[in-house]
């Protein structure tokens, strides 16, 4: 009984989907499906990667974003400065260990 219902539903699906194909013409000019695609030039412009893409920065090395970032890295490499920075802040810890910022 279940097999008959499944076959009936599959047959109806084939009739519904098959009937739509016969209503449309086969020529490309009359087909509305060509509207779903864009030209190769437009797709190339759309898919073009930015010059500052992630892989480019990884291969080249990312630029330092903050002027204090290099000093922060120096302080992090010194365990005493790093510990003091956790308590009183990076700038004050760097000033105490290495002089004025």
Swiss-Prot record:
Residues 1-18 form the signal peptide. Keywords: Biomineralization, Calcium, Cleavage on pair of basic residues, Disulfide bond, Gamma-carboxyglutamic acid, Hormone, Metal-binding, Secreted, Signal. Ca(2+) 1 binds at residue 69. One of its GO terms (biological process) is biomineral tissue development. Residues 53-99 form the Gla domain. InterPro entries: GLA-like_dom_SF (IPR035972), GLA_domain (IPR000294), Osteocalcin (IPR039176), Osteocalcin/MGP (IPR002384). The keyword Phosphoprotein does not apply. Residues 19-52 form a propeptide. Belongs to the osteocalcin/matrix Gla protein family. The carboxylated form is one of the main organic components of the bone matrix, which constitutes 1-2% of the total bone protein. The carboxylated form binds strongly to apatite and calcium. This is Osteocalcin. It comes from Xenopus tropicalis (Western clawed frog). The lineage of its organism: Eukaryota, Metazoa, Chordata, Craniata, Vertebrata.
């Amino acid at each position: 009984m279940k097999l008959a219902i499944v076959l009936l539903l599959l047959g109806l699906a084939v009739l519904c989907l098959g009937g739509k194909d016969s209503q449309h013409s086969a020529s490309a000019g009359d087909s509305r499906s060509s509207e779903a695609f864009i030209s190769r030039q437009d797709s190339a412009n759309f898919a073009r990667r930015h010059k500052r893409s992630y892989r480019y920065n990884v291969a080249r090395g990312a630029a330092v974003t903050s002027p204090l970032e290099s000093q922060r890295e120096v302080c992090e490499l010194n365990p005493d400065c790093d510990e003091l920075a956790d308590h009183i802040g990076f700038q004050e810890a760097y000033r105490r260990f290495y002089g004025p910022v």
